[in-house]
């Protein structure tokens, strides 16, 4: 049987092998969106408010897209009742803060990521102290309708 050129790693010239860890991890993102987008993702700061059912999946998708900095805001701990819908809910994570568990997952996916863990609820009265000034984007994954409405209003006033 003849070896095909792509069947053996020895066929690839050493100088063409990319040794930059970020480039290796996020090469698929570069192929889809281009180099400028990858660099923009790498320097972006995204805040996710609420890291439960919607937020946990969002956080992982952002980390897997090469986002450089995440701020995670939530006061809840992982509960056994979260197992059916929340990414971070596993036997070994029950009882731990959700933001802490997700921060660990993000660092395992992307070792160079910066994750700010804010173990607190976002409320109408504390948004200014919770949401960082340098945030580029904000994801609303809040359960509380009152807090959600306050966050929307706060964001509209800010930008």
Which stretches of residues belong to each language-model region?
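N-terminal charged helix/coil linker that caps or initiates catalytic domains
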Residues: 1-46
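Glycine-rich phosphate-binding loop and adjoining beta1-alpha1-beta2 segment
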Residues: 13-14, 67-110
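Glycine-rich adenosine-cofactor-binding loop
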Residues: 42-63, 69-74
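Conserved SAM-binding strand-loop segment of SAM-dependent methyltransferases
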Residues: 92, 113-122
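Short amphipathic alpha-helix with an adjacent loop that forms part of the alpha/beta core around
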Residues: 125-134
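Glycine-rich phosphate-binding loop
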Residues: 134-159
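Short glycine/serine/threonine-rich phosphate/pyrophosphate-binding segments
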Residues: 54-59, 80, 144-150
């Amino acid at each position: 049987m003849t070896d095909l050129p792509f069947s053996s790693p020895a066929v690839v010239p050493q100088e063409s092998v990319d040794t930059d860890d970020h480039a290796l991890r996020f090469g698929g993102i570069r192929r889809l969106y281009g180099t400028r987008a990858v660099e923009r993702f790498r320097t972006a700061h995204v805040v996710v408010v609420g890291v439960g059912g919607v937020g946990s999946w969002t956080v992982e998708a952002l980390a897997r897209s090469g986002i450089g900095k995440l701020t995670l805001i939530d006061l809840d701990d992982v509960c056994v009742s979260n197992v059916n819908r929340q990414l971070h809910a596993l036997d070994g994570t029950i009882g731990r803060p959700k933001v802490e568990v997700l921060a660990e997952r993000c660092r395992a996916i992307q070792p160079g990521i910066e994750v700010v863990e804010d173990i607190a609820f976002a409320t109408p009265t504390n948004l200014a102290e919770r949401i960082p000034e340098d945030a580029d984007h904000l994801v609303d994954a809040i359960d509380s309708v009152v807090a959600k409405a306050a966050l929307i209003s706060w964001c509209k006033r800010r930008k």
